[in-house]
Amino acid sequence: MPNQSRPKVKKSRALGIALTPKAVKYFEARPYPPGEHGRGRKQNSDYKVRLLEKQRLRAQYDISERQMARAYDRAKKAEGKTGEALVVELERRLDALVLRSGIARTIYQARQMVVHGHIEVNGGKVDKPSFRVRPDDIVQVRERSRSKVPFQVAREGGYDTDGETPRYLQVNLKALAFRLDRDPNRKEIPVICDEQLVVEYYAR
């Protein structure tokens, strides 16, 4: 079976962010882009800087360009700064919140949990990672899935890497459940991104 972590490690180094816990060690050991000449790359153009920032944000939510563009279109219609609204829009995705709650270890695992029908919202199965969670929605692992190993690990806090749960979530890992108390504030969302550069990319 091929090592599925290697492409993500290489992608992490190219984007300058660790996309998985395993990538953190590689990134710390080699904090430069992949390739023989990674350490001596030329200064990027303004366009490339904006493109890279957009790709960094996309990668942290593991979404397609089409999904990103749709989220940006919705963010433009929201009140306040478009960049902040974009990040909040992405953070309300079901797979993103499953990750933040500590039920999953990575965004990739969170997506699989949703796609495979292990997650329910307000008592009904939801298998779309892009499902937008609303304040007061209750998300939990379905009863039939709770005995599976990944969820047993989550129940014991095995995926909780920093001990901090975002303030917009109320989490009960023992019950494998959480509630979105309110819309997230951009400053509370743990993603690495200069969202203004992303806005400039789409507004070009």
From Swiss-Prot:
One Pfam match, given by its short name, reads Ribosomal_S4
Q: Which UniProt keywords are listed? A: Ribonucleoprotein, Ribosomal protein, RNA-binding, rRNA-binding
UniProt record, GO biological process: ribosomal small subunit biogenesis; translation
Question: HAMAP family this protein is in?
Answer: Ribosomal_uS4_B
What top-level branch of life does the organism fall under?
Bacteria
Give the similarity note. Answer: Belongs to the universal ribosomal protein uS4 family.
Q: Which GO terms describe its cellular component?
A: small ribosomal subunit
Is RNA-binding given among the entry's keywords? Answer: yes
PANTHER family referenced in this protein's UniProt entry, alphabetically: 30S 40S RIBOSOMAL PROTEIN (PTHR11831), SMALL RIBOSOMAL SUBUNIT PROTEIN US4M (PTHR11831:SF4)
User: What is the annotated role of this protein in its UniProt record?
Assistant: One of the primary rRNA binding proteins, it binds directly to 16S rRNA where it nucleates assembly of the body of the 30S subunit. With S5 and S12 plays an important role in translational accuracy.
Q: Does the keyword Repeat apply?
A: no
Identify this protein by name. Answer: Small ribosomal subunit protein uS4
Database matches in SMART domains:
Ribosomal_S4, S4
- What terms describe the molecular function in GO for this protein? rRNA binding; structural constituent of ribosome
Write the gene name.
rpsD
| Oligomeric and partner information | Part of the 30S ribosomal subunit. Contacts protein S5. The interaction surface between S4 and S5 is involved in control of translational fidelity.
Q: Which residues form the S4 RNA-binding domain?
A: 92-156
Q: Which residues form a coiled coil?
A: none
Q: Matching InterPro entries, A to Z?
A: Ribosomal_uS4, Ribosomal_uS4_bac-type, Ribosomal_uS4_CS, Ribosomal_uS4_N, S4_RNA-bd, S4_RNA-bd_sf
